[in-house]
Swiss-Prot record:
It is found in: Secreted; Cell surface; Cell projection, Cilium, Flagellum. Its main location: secreted. The lineage of its organism: Eukaryota, Metazoa, Chordata, Craniata, Vertebrata. It comes from Bos taurus (Bovine). This is Lysozyme-like protein 6. Residues 1-19 form the signal peptide. It catalyses: Hydrolysis of (1->4)-beta-linkages between N-acetylmuramic acid and N-acetyl-D-glucosamine residues in a peptidoglycan and between N-acetyl-D-glucosamine residues in chitodextrins.
Amino acid sequence: MTSPLLISLASCLVAVNQASLIGRCDLAKVLHQEDLDGFEGYSLTDWLCLAFVESDFNITKVNENTDGSFDYGIFQINSHYWCNDYQSRTENNCQVDCQELLSPNLLAIINCAKKIVSGAGGMKNWVKWRLHCAGRPLSYWMTGCHLA
């Protein structure tokens, strides 16, 4: 579902010095627009906390792991299991090129994250979410954000 909000958000990100950071409330709006609030039992605050602890809201973050795989994008999705980086062995369960997970419109990474969360373990698949977000009060992540 491509929306005018996603298109305008992508335009803003590209226009500001090729910025790769997205604001917390802007991300909340996109996630809400893409129906992630309540998806598989996780709230927008879970998704915001995940994005912060994994990437500090950096859409284009890439991190190399000790096993030679890479983590991509705002949710740091791993190339060994979820996307094809053409560098390391991959299962490519999301059937997507890893570079697409760095796109400012966020659709590819949101769709892949939904697939991950829909499977066994849900958000527990992200170690940093388990350590820093799970079971904690997270309502402050939405402070000052207006979704309408």
